[in-house]
């Protein structure tokens, strides 16, 4: 976002404020939907690098909106935060020792911004680009790191999951949580 603001003449960078508005507008939309009688549910994940960037830019408009989405008890049943990597690194190309470091860096920054209680509510993990390691050893270490860091579930693309016999999931199975075995 900062690069977009500083270089408005390049590509779509003139849209920097539209991006900033998107980062903060859910703090307006979710309460409005609740006031209208709806029961919205959304899952959000922002990389640690993005959160840090908002701080470095002094974007209190965005930070205040995120603070509300994370910490307002009235919004907590409607907004589920997911952990992710500190940077936007994709798991298949991240060195194995760095997987856990990426996870821990995000957790530490999220807790520093929003408090330990907010971090304790984060149960799911969203890997950048929903990429999972193809190599079984890397996938094992990735899942191991997630479990060691307290995550209970992982957001994946439905075609990434199959039945134990190798058959694809039925439509009904794809819409429900699945146990990793």
Which residues does each predicted region cover?
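Active-site-adjacent pocket scaffolds in enzyme catalytic domains
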Residues: 131-181
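Acidic-and-aromatic substrate-binding clefts and catalytic sites of carbohydrate-active enzymes
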Residues: 50-62, 90-99, 127-137, 161-166
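Well-ordered, non-membrane alpha-helical segments in soluble/globular domains
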Residues: 12-29, 58-69, 99-104, 137-145
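Conserved, mostly hydrophobic/aromatic
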Residues: 84, 125
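Conserved beta-strand positions
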Residues: 46, 127, 155-156
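N-terminal regions that are enriched for targeting/export leaders
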Residues: 1-38, 42
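Acidic (Asp/Glu)-rich catalytic clusters
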Residues: 29-39, 57-82, 107-118, 146-147
């Amino acid at each position: 976002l900062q690069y977009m603001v500083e270089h408005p003449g390049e590509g779509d960078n003139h849209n920097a404020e539209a991006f900033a508005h998107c980062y903060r507008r859910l703090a307006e939309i979710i309460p409005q939907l609740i006031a209208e009688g709806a029961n919205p549910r959304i899952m959000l994940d922002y990389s640690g690098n993005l959160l840090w960037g908002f701080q470095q830019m002094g974007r209190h408009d965005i930070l205040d909106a995120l603070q509300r989405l994370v910490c307002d008890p009235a919004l907590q049943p409607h907004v589920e935060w997911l952990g992710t990597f500190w940077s936007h690194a994709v798991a298949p190309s991240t060195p194995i020792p760095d997987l856990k470091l990426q996870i821990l860096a995000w957790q530490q920054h999220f807790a520093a911004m929003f408090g330990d209680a907010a971090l304790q509510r984060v149960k799911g993990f969203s890997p950048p680009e929903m990429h999972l390691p193809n190599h079984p050893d890397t996938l094992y270490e990735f899942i191991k790191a997630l479990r060691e860091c307290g995550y209970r579930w992982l957001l994946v693309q439905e075609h990434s999951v199959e039945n134990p016999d190798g058959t694809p999931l039925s439509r009904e199975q794809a819409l429900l949580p699945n146990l990793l075995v």
